[in-house]
Each structure stands twice: as structure tokens, then as C-alpha cells.
Amino acid sequence: MHINANIFTFLLIITGFVAVKTREIPPFLKICHRNDPNLNECIKRSVDSLRPYLKTGIPTLQIPPCEPLRVPRIEISQSAGPISLKSTYTDIEVQGGTSFILKSVKTDIDNDRVKLKLYLPRLEMNAQYNVDGKILMLPITGNGLARGNFTDIDVTAIIQGERYQSRKTGEIHYRVTDFYVDFDVGHANIHLDNLFNGDSTLSDAMNLFLNDNWKTVAAEIKPALENTVSELFKTFSNKIYSKFPLDTLLPP
């Protein structure tokens, strides 16, 4: 249930950087043109050429190292349904994101929309957590180290944007306005250290319960987590998109 931040960072890389002019980026990136009838395949090839460089990062593109991917903080507040809790995750580190497979890209240039399908074989996550609330009517409280392993992850994302004219330059820019994501995790294993003030009996029982019911828990938390990641994604991506005109990011 902690995978979305990692996934959307990679979606940002895919959609935001693969088509910047060569004079502004390293030569290993392929330029894609929006009038290319094979634009979707071009983007896929661009991503493949970028993949080896993601592990260590690309300073010239302001892409940080992605192995591990570091996310400073995520907060989740859920008050409706069978899960009612507040949780905070800090110092998040995720391994395995650069092993993603971009299965398909479908661009709709006229409507400023991109649809992506990805597959992630495995993600491993470590973070400091703080949680307090109830899960399926059972109380849960604790803070400490959270660890998670997620495998066979299928992701579908639809990123919606719009064009606007810069008041400073008069040039046309692009910004993300919304996105939809649906992900399916084949299997998950999570462990929260120091639950219930270190009571090993209660802690072991809760971790067993979470792993036995991880699909139910993930389904309940998913909307709140998606909203959180959506705002992070839009804020971060638009800071980057605002620097380049559309004709630079995706020339005709």
C-alpha cells in the first residue's frame, strides 16, 4: 500500500523528460516529436535509453538517484469505512523502481492526455512510520521501522494536462491538471516494528493480521493514498514543466 509514490515519480520521468532538446540534455536521450505517427513507440524507446542512468541520477535533468528512490514524507488520513487511522511515513526508501517495464504508451496530443501501462516485478520499501487508529475495527498504534515487499505490480495511469500561455514569454507551456491511476499488486508482505509500545504478542498478531488481510487494507487506503500522491505529483511535475515551452518538451 506504499508503492504509489515510487510509481508516479517514474511516470513523471517518463512523461516529462524524454523529449527535451539535445542541447539541454545528455546525448543518450532520444528526441520525440509530437507529429511523429509512431510517437508512442518513440517514447517507449526513449524510456529504454534512459533506464540505465536512472539508478545513479541525472543532475543535468534534475533527476535524483532512483536506487534507492527517496521520498521525504507521506501522510495518510482515513476516517471513513472499516479503516480509520492517521499515519505518517518519513525517510522512505524504495528499491526496484528502475526495473519497471513500460508495456504501452497511448498519447492523445489533441486532448493533452497520456495513458501508460507499466509492470513492476518487485519493490522493496523501508520507512519510519507513525500510526494511530483502527483497521477493520481492530486498534493499531505504533512508531518505528516499516518494511514492505511488493511483487507483480500492474499499473495503469491516465495523465491529463492542459496548455497555457506564459505571461512572461508568450510561449505555450504544458501543465498537469489531474490523473487517474489503477494498480494491481500480485502479492505484498509488510512488517511494522514497535507496534503497541513494543508488546511483542500484540505486535506479532497485528502484523500477521495485516499480511493476511493486506488486499482489504490496501483497497480501503487506496483512495486516500492516491489523493496524496496526486497532489505531490502535480506540484513536482508542474515545477519542471513550467521551465520549458511545449515546443521544447515535445517539438512538432
Regions of interest found by a model, annotated:
Residues 170-226:
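Extended amphipathic ligand-handling, pore-lining, and cofactor/metal-binding catalytic surfaces
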Residues 46-54, 58, 210-214, 218, ...:
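Sec/Tat-exported extracytoplasmic proteins
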Residues 1-3, 251-252:
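A positional/structural detector of protein chain ends, strongest at the extreme C-terminus
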Residues 3-22:
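Cleavable N-terminal signal peptides of Sec/SRP-targeted secreted and luminal proteins
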Residues 68, 72, 143, 224, ...:
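Residue-level signal for alpha-helical context at structural boundaries
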Residues 10-13, 111, 141, 202:
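N-terminal hydrophobic alpha-helix used for membrane targeting or insertion
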Residues 19-26, 231-252:
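C-terminal helix/juxtamembrane-tail motif
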Residues 21-186:
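Hydrophobic-cavity lipid-handling domains and compact docking modules
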